[in-house]
A protein has these predicted regions:
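Surface-exposed, glycine-biased beta-strand/turn segments
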Residues: 1-62, 66-70, 98, 107, ...
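Short edge beta-strand segments in beta-sheet-rich domains
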Residues: 25, 76, 113-116
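A cross-family glycoside hydrolase active-site/sugar-binding cleft signature
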Residues: 27-29, 82, 119
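Short alpha-helix capping/helix-loop boundary micro-motifs
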Residues: 33-35, 86-90
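Enzymatic toxin/effector payload domains
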Residues: 52-61, 80, 92-93, 116-121
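Short, solvent-exposed loop/turn segments that connect beta-strands within catalytic domains
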Residues: 66-76, 125-128
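Beta-strand/loop nucleic-acid-binding surfaces
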Residues: 78-86
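Conserved, short, structured surface segments that act as functional micro-motifs
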Residues: 94-149
């Protein structure tokens, strides 16, 4: 079992959860060290379960084994990442090793400035991977507060 790691080398949260465009969701935006494009490393060994290229190049990465959450519980973890400008190297079914560089900040979709939008959901990828929340925004299924992932 793995303990998930924060996927970015730098943490500069430009929009937190439950406010702004993240109202009614546990999404966070991380813009890295500066306005440039920083890369992300896989927080755990996972498999890409879905790619949605019609908006912000969203991908869903599901852990291949249960992970240990900060509170000690053990379950699968699925994360949603958005805004990479080029995901041509990614495909559904691709396995990405923990610590492997796999995604970058970007501006694809409705984004202002380079950043990555991240959400985590407890358990395996379910249904379409997301749902429309009470604010009319799309949010990952089985969402968890990012401090609990």
């Amino acid at each position: 079992m793995e303990k998930p790691l924060y996927p970015s080398q730098y943490m500069r949260i430009t929009e937190g959860y439950m406010k702004g465009s993240h109202r009614d969701s546990y999404a966070i935006d991380d813009a890295g060290i500066d306005q440039g494009i920083d890369y992300l490393k896989a927080p755990y060994t996972g498999v890409i379960k879905k790619i949605y290229q019609k908006d912000a190049n969203e991908i869903w990465l599901e852990s291949i084994e249960p992970v240990i959450y900060p509170d000690g519980t053990v379950d699968y973890l699925t994360m949603l990442f958005a805004h990479d400008n080029d995901i041509s190297n990614l495909f559904v079914g691709k396995v990405i090793a923990k610590g492997e560089r796999f995604y970058e900040e970007g501006t694809k979709g409705e984004a202002t400035g380079n950043h990555v939008h991240m959400e985590c959901g407890k358990g395996k990828f379910t249904n379409s991977g997301w749902h429309k929340n009470n604010s009319g925004h799309w949010s990952i299924n089985n969402a968890k507060n990012p401090t609990e992932c």
